[in-house]
């Protein structure tokens, strides 16, 4: 009886560890994707503002 209770406790701890690790990995992946999207949006906006200024400077306006 003690062995089955110990096995059950071990199985519960193992499953909780696996679920926590998976949730942590998913959260990290989501945060990384958000950071990448934010960086792309920043550089896109910067280029959109810089290109007209660069072309104006080249044309001497």
Curated annotation (Swiss-Prot):
What cystine linkages occur within this chain?
none
> What is the recorded post-translational modification?
Truncated sequences of this peptide have also been found in the venom. It is possible they have been cleaved in the venom.
What is the official name of this protein in its record?
A: U-poneritoxin(01)-Om5b
Q: What does this protein do?
A: Acidic peptide with potent hemolytic activities. It also shows low antimicrobial activities against E.coli (MIC=50uM), as well as histamine-releasing activity (28.3% at 10 uM). Does not have activity against S.aureus, and S.cerevisiae.
Report the locations given in the UniProt record. Answer: Secreted
Name the propeptide positions: 24-41
Keywords (alphabetical) are: Amidation, Antimicrobial, Secreted, Signal
Signal peptide interval: 1-23
What is the species listed in this Swiss-Prot or TrEMBL entry?
A: Odontomachus monticola
Instruction: List the record's Gene Ontology CC terms alphabetically.
Output: extracellular region
Q: Tell me which family the UniProt entry assigns to this protein.
A: Belongs to the formicidae venom precursor-01 superfamily.
Q: Which residues carry this modification: Glutamine amide?
A: 59
Q: Which Pfam family is one of those matched by this entry?
A: Pilosulin
Task: Write out the tissue specificity statement of the associated record.
Answer: Expressed by the venom gland.
